[in-house]
Amino acid sequence: MTESEFLKQAEATLDQIEATLEELANTSDLDVECTRSGNVLEIEFIDNGTKIIVNSQAPMQELWVAAKSGGFHFKAQGEQWMNTRDATELFAALSQMVSQQGGVEVVLRDAG
């Protein structure tokens, strides 16, 4: 994958995560605020002040996630982002992290 292809896929994924969480904040009990600065998406849980940070790392061609449960690296495999350690898909992993930190069961899905 070229750097421009990576950046395009990473940007689309960050956009999708942000849009999905904003929709969930409006339609469920999830109290979350998303802030985007370039390649960094900060997800703040209002009730407890914890955060999840998702950012793209172009040199490594990975998305990195920092959450209360730890740090995780995801590499593109086709249209999906897979955890480099245990092959968990990004949206499945984020669903679990957001549910844990937000105290509300949510499911995030990759629209791609």
From Swiss-Prot:
GO terms for molecular function: ferric iron binding. InterPro entries: CyaY (IPR047584), Frataxin/CyaY (IPR002908), Frataxin/CyaY_sf (IPR036524), Frataxin_CS (IPR020895). PROSITE patterns: FRATAXIN_1, FRATAXIN_2. SUPFAM superfamilies: Frataxin/Nqo15-like. It comes from the Bacteria. The keyword Iron applies. Keywords: Iron, Metal-binding. Pfam families: Frataxin_Cyay. GO terms for biological process: iron-sulfur cluster assembly. GO terms for cellular component: cytoplasm. PANTHER family: FRATAXIN, FRATAXIN, MITOCHONDRIAL. Belongs to the frataxin family. HAMAP family: CyaY (MF_00142). Involved in iron-sulfur (Fe-S) cluster assembly. May act as a regulator of Fe-S biogenesis. This is Iron-sulfur cluster assembly protein CyaY. It comes from Herminiimonas arsenicoxydans.
